[in-house]
């Protein structure tokens, strides 16, 4: 078994009679993502258990290492501060739009809805008091807006390299927090919503000080204003996140050594 991830509450009832628990013990080797999983499996009686880590750290590092520049985004950002809001839902949009509509700073915003839906994107644009532009419509002549809305799929992970700070969607509602490792490797501060308890990497980055959880509009404003006005502090905060990814990569090589 590769990259196993187990939780105590999920497996308490499995042993000794459950089919799944017995099946787990039939593996010659079980490679797990974290120390808690290793202890759980060892407590079931499996001795060939190894902590290999999470291959997602390797994937985001590999993505960062590729030269995937996006000319349109470079032209849009210019020399201004830029926030990328990735995989946002309606609950996230309300907080973002409220800030955008009252923002007095010289800021660029790249908004990436979780669901690329024409009607929902139109509704989002209507809620923003400033003029916005769609990625599909962007050109050298049509580039005067400070708000760019991404209306195609497949480029989100590549957008984070242009961010000075990032908001990750999904945490303000029940949808589930989106990938926070993708922006972390680029060394930027990350803001998320209030619901993140099921995401160990988010909890770790918050404990380290590289990520911030907000519950409402005011907390979001306070955090963004601080990061935008304190560039040196923002850079140090972002470095915490990139170091977190670098410190945890290497699972792929460990797994290959067992194959």
Map each language-model feature to its residues.
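Short hydrophobic/aromatic-enriched beta-strand-loop microsegments
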Residues: 1-2, 48-54, 106-112, 132, ...
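Active-site and donor-binding regions of nucleotide-sugar-utilizing enzymes
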Residues: 1-66, 84, 88-90, 102-103, ...
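Catalytic binding pocket for nucleotide-activated donors in carbohydrate/polymer assembly enzymes
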Residues: 27, 43, 156, 161-238, ...
């Amino acid at each position: 078994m590769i990259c196993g991830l187990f939780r105590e509450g999920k497996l308490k009832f499995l042993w000794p009679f459950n089919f799944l628990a017995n099946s787990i013990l039939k593996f010659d080797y079980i490679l797990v993502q974290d120390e808690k999983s290793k202890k759980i499996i060892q407590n079931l009686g499996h001795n060939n258990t190894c902590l290999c880590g999470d291959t997602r750290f390797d994937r985001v590092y590999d993505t960062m290492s590729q030269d995937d520049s996006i000319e349109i985004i470079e032209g849009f950002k210019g020399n201004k501060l830029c926030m990328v809001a990735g995989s946002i839902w309606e609950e996230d949009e309300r907080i973002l739009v409220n800030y955008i509509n009252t923002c007095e700073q010289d800021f660029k915003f790249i908004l990436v809805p979780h669901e690329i839906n024409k009607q929902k994107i139109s509704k989002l644009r209507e809620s923003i008091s400033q003029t916005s532009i769609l990625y599909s419509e962007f050109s050298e002549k049509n580039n005067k807006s400070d708000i760019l809305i991404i209306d195609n799929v497949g480029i989100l992970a590549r957008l984070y390299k242009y961010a000075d700070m990032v908001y990750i969607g999904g945490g303000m509602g029940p949808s589930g927090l989106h990938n926070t490792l993708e922006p972390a490797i680029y060394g930027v501060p990350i803001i998320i919503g209030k619901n993140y308890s099921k995401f160990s990497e988010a909890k770790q980055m918050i404990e380290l000080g590289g990520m911030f959880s907000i519950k409402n509009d005011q907390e979001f404003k306070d955090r963004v204003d601080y990061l935008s006005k304190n560039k040196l502090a923002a850079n140090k905060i972002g470095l915490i996140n990139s170091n977190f990814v670098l410190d945890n990569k290497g699972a792929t090589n460990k797994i290959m050594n067992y194959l």
